[in-house]
Structure formats: structure tokens, C-alpha cells
Amino acid sequence: MSPTAAPQKLSKVEDLKARSQYLLEPILSQLQEESTHFNEDGIQILKFHGSYQQDNRDNRVKGQEKDFQFMLRLRSPGGYIPPQLYLTLDQLADDYGNGTLRATTRQAFQLHGILKRDLKTVIRRIVENLGSTISACGDVNRNVMAPPAPFRDRPEYEWARTYANNIADLLTPESGAYYELWLDGEKVLSGEPDPAVLAARRNPKGRVADSVEPLYSDRYLPRKFKIAVTVPGDNSIDLFTQDIGLVVIGNDRGELEGFNVYVGGGMGRTHNKEETFARLADPLGFVPAADIYAAVQAIVATQRDYGDRSNRRHARMKYLIHDWGIAKFKEAVESVFGKAIAPVRELPPFRYRDYLGWHEQGDGKWFLGLPITSGRIKDDGNWQLRSALREIVSRWQLPLLLTGSQDVLIYDVQPGDRAAIDKLLRDRGVHTVEAIDSLQRYAMACPALPTCGLAITESERALPGLLVRIRRLLEEQGLPDEHFVVRMTGCPNGCARPYMAELAFVGSAPNTYQLWLGGSPDQTRLARPFIDRLADGDVETQLRPLFVFFKQSRQAGESFGDFCDRVGFDALRQFSESYQHEAAKPRYRVGLRADVHGRLKAEADKRGVSLTDLACEAIAAYLR
């Protein structure tokens, strides 16, 4: 028997959604106004169309209007970006944006710096060139993730990409408001949905009869909703942070049998609100491939009907599952689904993959994974990343795949073109994975200041300098090649998934962060807060004893996050509190003539001592 939804006092946003005429107003009216920005109601509805209103805090002047601008986020299931779309986005960044593109942690692109008067033009150009911003934000299903690796000889990767795309189509809002607002009612489509998706939309289970939005209803979902599809063992998409995580499972004949389903993950939390927290997804069960669309709709419908619509801080599906327990949630889903859900199948351990460097696709072609610091694609001095990507995509007409770690894969590369692409990247000063610090490889940051309205402090702009400081500390301890997962955010909302990191900095005040420790290198375990308020100037003081303890007490091959989790926070605090840092002793340099150096070295070799020790002994004897 399914539970009964208790009456709720709805939040203001819930009432606004119901009055929006299925996401049309007040955007339609306010687009016709001469103002540079939308009001609060407009801001909320605009999110469903893939845009956030922002202002550049670096440009604020007392007594003057804020520097209003807009971020546009694309929907690109599995991170797929065709050449035509990429070149369009690159041009739009110059014509209407701030001259950069940003790859997100959910395999999509963002354009920043768009003015209100240009929104319609930019969105239309995106849609006309095989892209879309619909449902990239808002209380709906967001961009669906999948492993970015374009393997052609491993069917499980093809299944993951196909189902990610189809589920994105299945859960796209059906209201025509998007096309009415941005394309004057013209429904521009890049292709019809898969027939199985169309059939699933006709399934009445979990859908609202006679509604413009039969799955979402007029209030849409209580909060954002995130889905990823992956293959056994591949955690390139942070499976356990999703509202729904699907794992494709095949048989020995190379056929897709079904999916393990995980539910209830989520990162967002609020400082000093203990009722908000990051959470890992729970296993729900195994669903045959023929039933997966119905199962996904049943899960979404359960969250639609029972998720908290009175308190947006408590509205994600993770809180519903936490409050109910997975057994009760499963029962509610089964009542909509109409079938019992079998236990999950056994899987191999999940490992993090980033697919950087050159890889064979399995069809004679290659793909190249390029590291992108915080996902920001720009030209900066001798580092001409944006120019290099533009030239590669334009010259060879190559598609891209974005990763969940804000990097870019260039794929379908002919073997004979590899050398030319490598040379082009070198000429443009673009570093491949072999040339970057391994800390940078495994680090992520959200944009934060100056444009994100939720940012408390710096993140993207602070991360490069922070990584340099961490590397110096590691070198100080004789760990010059050590690396681990570092993530940084300007607020606690978790956009860069910091609560899965081995070491995370979560903005809590200007130039101040919460320090989180103990996540796993494969992002399968939550980190925990270690220091509540860490001032930027105290980073070395607080991290140094942790790295000293790590160097002294780690097990063979043990990562920093695993070490912190194994020894426990009490031991970490005890060591840190008792640690006395000895400043490095001064080292003096003395020059020697070449003939004297040669004689000293020969004598040192003869005695079996170091050159330094022998030189000190000789000088001391002379001074006596």
C-alpha cells in the first residue's frame, strides 16, 4: 500500500510555479520591458529555461545599479557537443558573453555575461545549432550524465550513452513555453525521441491525466533532480551523488539485461542547519531494460507527490528517503510502477576515471582527453586553449564530449591526425595531462565570485594558488608526487561535489572555509567536516601537521582520504594539537673553484662520505 501525501503549507515558489502558466509567465511579460533584469518571480521561473540572473560583484559601485548579467546553461546528455554547436557557442561567447566558455561538473557548457536584451537571440542561436537550454536548471530533471569515454567496442558504454539521452528526452518538460518565449512558437527539434520514449510517455502510471505536464504537473518537482547512467566499475560521473543512479548490466552474450538502480544521493546543505546534509544514494534494486523508463517515471512521480513542498531546504528526494527509509520509499515506487523491484545485482568496485590523454576508441579512431582547470575555456596570454579548441573542431570537424570533472574529450580522431593535433596544442601553449600537476588533475572548483549570487567567498579564482600551496607543503614532507582529490566551493551548496573529496574547502565566510576530510579517491565515501572555520591565511598551519602525520603513519599505497578515514578524526586532531613545527634550518651556499671541487669530490668518494660533510670538516679544521 502506498503512503498518503500529507497536506502541506506550500512555499512561495510552489505557488509561483502553479501561477506561471506552465513556465510562461512572468518571463513573457518581463521580456517586453526595457529593464536590465527580471524581478524575483521572473528569476525563479527563468531557471527552468536554463538561465540564472547574476550580477558581477567586481563591478558594483555604491549608488549605481548592479551589473546585471545572465548565465546560460546547456542541456547536453552524456556531455555530447557536436562541432556545429561548439563553434556556435565559441562565437556567442565573443558576440554576447564574457569571452569564455565553462564546462560544468554535469557535462554541460555554460555561457556567462549575457545581457537580458540578448537572451532571446542567444538561446535561439543555440537551439538552431543543435543545442538547448531547456530544463538545464529549475525544479525538474537536470542534465543526465554518462561516462564520456566514446568506446565503440564496449557495448555497455553505448548503452549508457543511449539511455542517458533517452531519459533526458523522457523527462523534458512538455509545455510549449520554452519555444513560445525564445523561438516565437517555432518548435525546432534536432530529432524525434526514441520510439520507446514516446511509448513510455503514453504509460498512464504516475502521470497526471489531462495536464499540460502529465509527469511534472503544474508545480513541477519540489526541487532539482539529477540522474546519471554508468557502467559497472566506472565512477566518472559520481554515481552516489545522484537522485537516481543507473548502472547498465549485460550478459555473456553481449545483451543488455537491465539496470541496478540507486536513489537518494545529493550534495547540497546549509551551514549551521543540521537538518540539511550531503547523502549517498541507496540501492533500490534491479530493473529489466524493458521496464526502466517506467521505473524512472515511478521514482520521479513518488518524489513529485511526497517530496517536501513547504521547505525548499528539505525538498530534495534524499530527505524523503532519509525520513521514510529505503523500504518505505521502495514500496511507494512499486505501487506506481506496478511491479516488485528485484534486489540489485552484484557489481565490481567503482573506480574514478577521467579519460585524460590519448585512448583508442575501438573502431580504429582515437580520442584525446584534455585537462581544463575548473572547466574554464579561455585564451590567457600564451595559454591559448580556446583558440586551440576552435581550430581543432573547425579544421577536423570533430565532436566533443564533456566529462563530469570539467574536462573535454576530442573524439573520432583519425590516427594520422594525432601528430598534427599534438603540435597545434603545443603551439598554442595548451598542456596535456602529462604536463600538469597531478593535484590539478584531480581538483574541481565552482565559479563562485564574482558572478554567483550564492557565493560567500572565492573558489575558481582561488583554486590554482591553493593547489600551489598544497604542493609546497607536500614537497616539504618529501611527498613531491603525492596527489588526491581536492575540491573547492564558494558556498555549502555543493556544486563541485566537495563532500566526496579527500580534501575539500567549503566557503563559510569571506576568505574562510570549512575543511572537509576523508572522502575516497574513487568518490564512494562521504567526507566529514574537520575544521569549521579555516581562514585562508591559516591553510599551511592547519594542513602541515596532517601531511606530517600522513607521511609518518600511512599504510603502503594508502591515499590521503583513506588515511584520514582509517585513523579517525580524534587521532588527526590529537596529532595536530601536539605537533610542533620546526622552521627549516638555513642553508648557506659557498662557491668553490673547479680544481678544488674536483679534489674534494675525489677525496669524498675515497672516504665514502658526502661532499658536504667533507667540505665542512676541512673548513672547520682550517678555522681551528
Swiss-Prot record:
<dbReference type="InterPro" id="IPR006067">
    <property type="entry name" value="NO2/SO3_Rdtase_4Fe4S_dom"/>
</dbReference>
<dbReference type="GO" id="GO:0046872">
    <property type="term" value="F:metal ion binding"/>
</dbReference>
<keyword id="KW-0004">4Fe-4S</keyword>
<dbReference type="GO" id="GO:0000103">
    <property type="term" value="P:sulfate assimilation"/>
</dbReference>
<dbReference type="InterPro" id="IPR036136">
    <property type="entry name" value="Nit/Sulf_reduc_fer-like_dom_sf"/>
</dbReference>
<dbReference type="GO" id="GO:0051539">
    <property type="term" value="F:4 iron, 4 sulfur cluster binding"/>
</dbReference>
<feature type="binding site">
    <location>
        <position position="491"/>
    </location>
    <ligand>
        <name>[4Fe-4S] cluster</name>
    </ligand>
</feature>
<dbReference type="InterPro" id="IPR045854">
    <property type="entry name" value="NO2/SO3_Rdtase_4Fe4S_sf"/>
</dbReference>
<feature type="binding site" description="axial binding residue">
    <location>
        <position position="495"/>
    </location>
    <ligand>
        <name>siroheme</name>
    </ligand>
</feature>
<feature type="binding site">
    <location>
        <position position="446"/>
    </location>
    <ligand>
        <name>[4Fe-4S] cluster</name>
    </ligand>
</feature>
<dbReference type="InterPro" id="IPR011787">
    <property type="entry name" value="SiR_ferredoxin-dep"/>
</dbReference>
<keyword id="KW-0408">Iron</keyword>
<feature type="binding site">
    <location>
        <position position="495"/>
    </location>
    <ligand>
        <name>[4Fe-4S] cluster</name>
    </ligand>
</feature>
<keyword id="KW-0349">Heme</keyword>
<keyword id="KW-0479">Metal-binding</keyword>
<feature type="binding site">
    <location>
        <position position="452"/>
    </location>
    <ligand>
        <name>[4Fe-4S] cluster</name>
    </ligand>
</feature>
<feature type="cross-link" description="3'-(S-cysteinyl)-tyrosine (Tyr-Cys)">
    <location>
        <begin position="52"/>
        <end position="137"/>
    </location>
</feature>
<dbReference type="GO" id="GO:0016002">
    <property type="term" value="F:sulfite reductase activity"/>
</dbReference>
<dbReference type="Pfam" id="PF03460">
    <property type="entry name" value="NIR_SIR_ferr"/>
</dbReference>
<protein>
    <recommendedName>
        <fullName>Sulfite reductase [ferredoxin]</fullName>
        <ecNumber>1.8.7.1</ecNumber>
    </recommendedName>
</protein>
<keyword id="KW-0883">Thioether bond</keyword>
<keyword id="KW-0560">Oxidoreductase</keyword>
<dbReference type="InterPro" id="IPR006066">
    <property type="entry name" value="NO2/SO3_Rdtase_FeS/sirohaem_BS"/>
</dbReference>
<dbReference type="Pfam" id="PF01077">
    <property type="entry name" value="NIR_SIR"/>
</dbReference>
<keyword id="KW-0411">Iron-sulfur</keyword>
<dbReference type="GO" id="GO:0020037">
    <property type="term" value="F:heme binding"/>
</dbReference>
<dbReference type="InterPro" id="IPR005117">
    <property type="entry name" value="NiRdtase/SiRdtase_haem-b_fer"/>
</dbReference>
<dbReference type="GO" id="GO:0050311">
    <property type="term" value="F:sulfite reductase (ferredoxin) activity"/>
</dbReference>
<comment type="subunit">
    <text>Monomer.</text>
</comment>
<comment type="function">
    <text>Catalyzes the reduction of sulfite to sulfide, a step in the biosynthesis of sulfur-containing amino acids and cofactors.</text>
</comment>
<comment type="similarity">
    <text>Belongs to the nitrite and sulfite reductase 4Fe-4S domain family.</text>
</comment>
<dbReference type="GO" id="GO:0009337">
    <property type="term" value="C:sulfite reductase complex (NADPH)"/>
</dbReference>
<dbReference type="InterPro" id="IPR045169">
    <property type="entry name" value="NO2/SO3_Rdtase_4Fe4S_prot"/>
</dbReference>
